[in-house]
């Protein structure tokens, strides 16, 4: 049986991988904000002792992995395989960044740096296969970081404080290496729109409580 010309067995394999990776994201969400080693024998023992499956993360990651396989597809071309692999690697890191930022309003430098380093490796690998694609990804990093850096600086001048943290600047610089300059502009616009909507909702709910 095939879905979008891909054998359903591949979806099952990717889905199971997503379940495992989703639970690993929970592990990272605990370790990274504390600036501790992700892999630690002592923590592993403690984690497994109090182990609780994070079903939302597990099934959410599994769904995203299968969606990536569906939309990116499978190809015998090396550059397409690299493209699929980089999104499978990026997904759990983005989920971890979102969860930590939502809870603590920070994005750990180690997480941003890891994304940047992995993005750089894929940029160089894809650039060797297609120089134009490599340049596009490099420009994506410059544009992504540049847009958020400008907004952060302008926000600081107008409001006297950062409009957003430099963790966001680093994050967008790293994401640019994965998506390229055109997509990172679209992602930036979507991010601003979502941030504006969330801010309006929070302000409205706060005002309602004070009335």
Located regions from the model:
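A membrane-topology feature that recognizes alpha-helical transmembrane segments
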Residues: 1-211
């Amino acid at each position: 049986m095939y879905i979008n010309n891909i054998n359903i067995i591949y979806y099952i394999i990717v889905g199971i991988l997503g379940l495992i990776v989703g639970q690993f994201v929970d592990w990272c969400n605990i370790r990274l904000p504390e600036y501790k080693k992700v892999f630690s024998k002592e923590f592993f023992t403690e984690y497994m002792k109090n182990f609780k499956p994070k079903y939302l993360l597990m099934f959410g990651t599994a769904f995203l992995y299968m969606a990536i396989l569906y939309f990116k597809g499978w190809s015998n071309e090396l550059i397409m395989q690299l493209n699929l692999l980089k999104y499978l690697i990026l997904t759990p890191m983005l989920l971890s960044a979102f969860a930590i930022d939502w809870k603590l309003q920070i994005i750990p430098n180690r997480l941003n740096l890891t994304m940047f380093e992995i993005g750089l490796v894929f940029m160089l690998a894809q650039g060797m296969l297609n120089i134009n694609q490599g340049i596009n990804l490099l420009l994506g990093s410059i544009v992504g970081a540049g847009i958020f850096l400008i907004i952060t600086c302008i926000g600081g001048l107008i409001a006297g404080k950062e409009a957003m943290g430099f963790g966001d600047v680093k994050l967008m610089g790293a994401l640019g290496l994965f998506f390229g300059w055109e997509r990172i502009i679209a992602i930036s616009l979507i991010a601003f729109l979502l941030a504006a909507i969330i801010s309006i909702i929070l302000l409205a709910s706060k005002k309602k409580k004070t009335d």
